[in-house]
Structure formats: structure tokens, C-alpha cells
Amino acid sequence: MTPQRPTAPTRRAVLLAAAAAASLTAVPRAAAAAADPYDALRHRWLDITLGTGYDPSAEPYASRLAETGARAREHRATMAPTPTSLWPGHPFDPPAGITFAYGRLWTMTEAYVQEGTGATGDPALLADILRGLDHLSATVYNPATTRYGNWWEWQIGSPRLLMDITAALYDHLGADRVAAACAAVDHFVPDAMLGDYTGTSTGANRVDLCRSVALRGVLGRAPAKLALARDALSPVFPYVTEGDGLYADGSFVQHTWVAYSGTYGQVMLDGLGRLFTLLAGSEWEVTDPGKQIVLDSVERAYAPLIHDGLVMDIVNGRAISRGYLKSDDLHVMRSDHFHGQQIVAAMAVLAGGASDAERERWSARIKGWIERDTVTPILTAPQFPVADLARLHAIAAAPGEAAPEPAGHHLFAAMDRAVHRRPAFTAGLAMASDRIAHYECGNGENPRGWHTGAGMLTWWANGAASDRSGRSGRSGRSGRSGRSGRSDQYTDWFWPTVDWYRLPGTTVSTQRLPDRAGGEWGAPKPEVSWVGGTTDGEYAAVGQHLKGLGSTLQARKSWFFLDDAVICLGAGITCADGVPVETVVDNRNLGEGGTQALVRGRHWAHLEGHGGWIVPGGTLRTLREDRTGSWSDINTTSATERRTRRWQTLWLDHGTDPVDADYVYTVMPGASRAALARRAADRHWLTVLANDGRRQAVTVPSLGLTAANFWRAGAAGPLTATAGASVLVRRRGRTATLSVSEPPRTGEALEIVWDHPVGAVLRADETVEILATGRRLHLRVTPGVVCATHECEVTLS
């Protein structure tokens, strides 16, 4: 499928796009200042939720509305109230059945209130919606019920849907039903939930709770509830230095120890966008200046993690295991593209509260993602209701150029993640430390994510012949297409069919682990602190002191992210588990029956349509196999359908119980066979200066680069460090820049010596003290405790 581009718009389409675009700009204050502010806010919420400025008879809206009507009719036909359920097979215990029931009633409500569904204003449909609401209110979702099971269903999932239904059907419910809905929310989301910023009331969860309370304030005409919801957002805004929330380096953490920008981060971004827009211009407008941090996060925290419409699974936590959910009537795959597109749609919502300059930049990025996502085209993505489609189409049709994916390196040190973007490829790295968990499981999800933080390196070649056409969306079909640059490597049934002991880039003990090893909710964390790196914004040195989950394995792993390659070093690989230890050079999903050729050369291997690897030492082992699995294997809430995918695995075997084993290899995503062979034959391109348990360092003369990760005080080539540090030196003509960080995060001052003649100091961060120049450069760095990069630039002599 080719990239989806807007066709030449008709005059009517232009007018509709203009109307929708207007809804993304400043919200008219007059509307909120109407004689009845609660009605004004309710109507504004419906505009946000149900959409405005679109033609229901035009595509893609007509089809989407017709589908909504068809689902509503199916739900009506199968609704069968009993004391323990509203639909057969979905009991109220566990309480996910309650949220499920409200979800179906919301679909029926959409069909009733929206034009073009074939059920608009149908009195029989309304009667059944009211019957369902009354049944839930009478049997389970009321102040007389004591919560059981998963708290989220009671305090976020169900009240959010109940408030939306109540807002949409307000004129048809009568005072008693509205009062009952408000009383239920008051019971399950009491004011105390929005008090202390702790427990389950932080980050994205806090925003969700505020959303329900704000709507309860609107529908119950309760100004104190609106004020409470607004004020309870303020703790979400500031940057945090530990626990849940946004960090100054763009990291987003939820559940205290889990990198979660892609799912919980999206929920927070979307929820804040809706609440900012809802309350703008009213007496409850969000005026806290910390709101700007949220707006800044679009470009600092979220956009760097999005590649061609997907958000990297390294920040999706346990959601990587969902795929097709049993409870999803739409049967849409919860993939990296699904989650990424949800973030893109959230940006469109948040644009309503952004400045003109911010809105212009965001729109350019969104246009680019719309053009480049060929896996599940965004403008017809099946998960979106018409409201999101209208906002996205308005952006696509508006003037302005689409922005390309920017090159650069983003080190998210607070969540042990790194993203590297180059013209030829994009890569993401996941690590773990005493701050960030190996993985998260919980609620029956992701029980085998054990090694996803063991140095997993995921990458996409930009423009490489892909030979694969796996789709997410409703079919999930896969095959060969030869299309270049498809970004479905981790979308096309990757997680249910991958060998969980052979995740790409990881070093692991092959000791078998039980499901949920280490505990749930981010409990398993290694007792290591040296995880992080340094970057000049273009290249980077990143390292991980690895301790295996449920294992005696220890290793030091380093990655040097360069122009067209990632140099990977491992050292000190030691284990006493009595089983082999492996480093997985890569594990590529070839799709269903993939026939891409793997060609071996002297110290290299090339995979057609993907790229290649240079392995100068050790024996590179390879395996091509078909693997079969279902999403239900890794998620109890997911579908049981089984699919087979073909895999190409490359690994290094360190043997049983290795002591101080090591490795060196280079990944060249998207490289041609000829380019790979030339690089492998060039003995002068790369020199490994050190690779042991004390330091790992490389130099690449053609790039003017020398980089080192010091695990302790020591020297490597021309560099010396007095403590654990990450150092990157870039020479450009007659100048050089040194970038230094302290990944152990002790905060103690350290000294760096670069044994190279230097002249003047052109610039230096306040944290960098120049101790000497001349024959060599001698620095003292006061690093702080967040693994920040500290720079100085000097002239060469």
C-alpha cells in the first residue's frame, strides 16, 4: 500500500477542513462564558469526543459511521441482562466485564447521536441503551457496591465511559439517571483519590481520574468538582527526578520503574489535551504555568520515539503482548503502529491548547507520519472514531509541508532508553538498572518479557528493500511485497512468535525461566547503577552493566552509535548457571514464509532487504526457523488464533559458564551486500582500543571519533578517566568537542584527560572546569546525578 496522501480537495472539503482546523486553534471564550457554563462545557466535550467539522456522507467518515451503526445493531441483538452480566460471556466478575458493558453501550450511544450510522435518533436503540444503563446501575455500578478485582476498571475504565454516555444522552436521561451516574463516580472516585499524589493516583492514572471527576462536575453542575479536577492536574506537570512522570530528559515513567512513554504516556497526553481544551476560557481554565512542560513534551519526549507512525515497543511496557484482544469488537491489533498512531492523535487534540508556532511544527511532523506510515495508513486507521479522523484529516489538508524524520541521537537516561536516527536507519535500545525494571508483567500480560531490558536493540532500515508486507489492522496478513522501507518488523506477529531467549542485541543465560519471573508490576530490577551514556546529539556512547534476571550472569555491554552503523562491544561475560550463554547479534522477523537470502562472507553476513553485520572474531551461528504462536500465549486477555512467522537468528555462543568472555560486532541496518563487504575488508575504519571489564573504547578515524565507556577509573587509548564515565570525542577540522557523562550517577566530581594537543577553549558548560590545555586537555566535571552530558569545545594545535 502506498503512502496515503490527501487528494485534491473540493471546495466543500476545504471549508470542512477549515472548520475542523479552527477547532484545533484557540477555543472561543465566548462559548464558555454563556449563561449556562455547564451546558457549554458539555457541548464542547461532545465536540471533542464525537467530532466536528466533517461531512458524514464523505469518506472515510461514511464507512466508519456505518460500521458504528452495524456494531450497535449487533450489540442490541445480543444484549441479555442477567444479575451477573449484560452480555453473555462477559460477566461482571472480573470487573473488566463492567467496563466492557459500558464500552458497548458507548458504541450504541455513538450510533444514536451521530449522523450517518443508520440508527441516528432510533427510539428503540435509545430504549435499549437506557435499559443497559439502568441494569448496570442497579446491579453493580452503584454506591452500594464494594470494589473487587482490578481497581482500574472501577476508577478509570468504567467511569470514563459512563461520563461520556451521560454527556451524550444528557437530554434523554432525566434527572434521576444523571444523579445516579454522578453518585457512582463520587463513590468509586472519591475526592480523596485526587488528594495525595501517590499510589495509583499519579502520572497518566491521575489524568484519567481527573477526566472523570471533571465530567462529573459538568454533568452534576458541581463547581467544586471542576475545581478539584483542575487543581489535581498540577502535580502531573512538573518534571520529576524519581518515580512516575515526565523527566527533564524526555523520559516518561509509570509504575515507578517502567519506561512507558508509548502507552501510559499517550494516555496522559491525550487526557491533558482533552481537559485543557474543555476548560479553556471557563472559570476553571488550567492556568498553571507548568502546563507548558506538557506542551514541550510533544517534541522532547514523544516525537523522538515515533518512527513512521509507530512508537517503539521499548516504551510500551507490558502492552507489547496484547495484539488482538478478545474484548475488542473492532479486532484491531494493538501493535507499535497502533500505539504510535494513538500518540499522533493525542498530539492533534493537544494542539487546541498550543501556540501557533507549536501547532505549526506539530502539524508538519504529523503530516510526515501520515505520509510515511504505509503499514496501517493513519487517515483510515481502524481504531480511530470520526472525531480523531476529522482532526487528522484537517491537519493533512491544511497548508504546509510534511516534516521528514530528523536525524540525531536521543538519550533518555532516566528510563534507560536510547534512540538513534540516521538517514539510513532508526534504532532503539532498551536497558535495565536499579532505577528501571528488566520488564513489566501483570494482569496476565507479558509474562515472558524477561530479557527485553537486557540490551535489546531494535532497528528499522529506511528505504531498504523489505520483502515483507505484514499488516496490522484487521487482517494481520503477511506476505512478500518487495516494498522498501516498511516499518512492520515488530508489528507483524513479532512478539507471539519470537524466541524470548533470543531477543535482538541481548546477552542472556539460556537458563529457563518461569512465567512472571522476578515478580509483577516492574518488580524485577538488577542491582546495578552504571547504565547510560553520553551524546553530542548526533553520535553516542551508551553502556550497560548487565546482571541477568534470575541468573548469575554479569556482563558489560557498550554501543557506539555512529553515522551508518552501531558498534557493539561486550566484555566480562561471566556466568555460573551451568547452561550456555549467548549474545544475540540479531533476530529478524522474515514474515510468513520469507525467502530473503542470507549471504555469508569473510567476517560478515548480509540479509536481503534488511542489512548486515560484521563479526571480526568468534563464530557467528545462524538459524532459520518457522515459529508459531498466539497472542494468548503471552496475554490472557488476547485472542487464541495462531500464526507462523519465519525467523533469521544470528548469535555468538559464549559456552557454558563463561568467564570474562567478550565480543565485537557491528550492525549496519539497510546496508547493501557490497557496502557491507567493503566495510568488513577495511581494516582501518575501526580500531577497538579496549574491551574488557574495566573499559570499552573505539576510534573511527574517518569520523574523527574516539569514544569510551569507563566502568571504573582507567585509560583507553588517548583517554583517561578518574572514575566511571562515558566519553565521546568528535574532531571536526581544527576543533574538537568532548562530551562527558557519569552513568553511575554518584554526583561526585571526576577528571578526564584527552592526550592530544589543544589550544584555546571555545566553550565549556558551567559544570566543566578546564584544568590544563597545551600538550593535552585536562578537565574536571561536576556531573550531577541524572547522567546528563557535559561538553567543552577546543581548538586543536
Task: Place the predicted regions along the sequence by residue.
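Extended polysaccharide-engagement surfaces of secreted carbohydrate-active enzymes
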Residues: 275-737, 741-749, 753-760
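N-terminal mature-domain "stem" immediately C-terminal to a signal peptide or N-terminal signal-anchor/transmembrane
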Residues: 37-71
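Small-residue (G/S/T/A) turn/hinge positions that recur once per unit in extracellular repeat modules
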Residues: 766-770
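C-terminal segment of N-terminal export signals and the immediately downstream linker at the start
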Residues: 13, 28-44
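Hydrophobic h-region of N-terminal signal peptides that target proteins for export
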Residues: 22-26
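C-terminal beta-strand-rich structural cap/linker in extracellular carbohydrate-active enzymes
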Residues: 664, 777-797
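N-terminal secretory signal peptides
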Residues: 1-9, 20
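Aromatic-lined, polymer-binding surfaces characteristic
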Residues: 76-323
